[in-house]
């Protein structure tokens, strides 16, 4: 599982 978030 891979998650990426940009804020």
Curated annotation (Swiss-Prot):
Reported tissue expression: Expressed by the venom gland.
Q: Which UniProt keywords apply?
A: Secreted
Q: Name one GO cellular component term.
A: extracellular region
Instruction: From the Swiss-Prot or TrEMBL record, state where the protein is found.
Output: Secreted
Keyword match Secreted = yes
Protein name according to UniProt: Venom peptide Ocy5
């Amino acid at each position: 599982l891979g998650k990426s978030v940009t804020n």
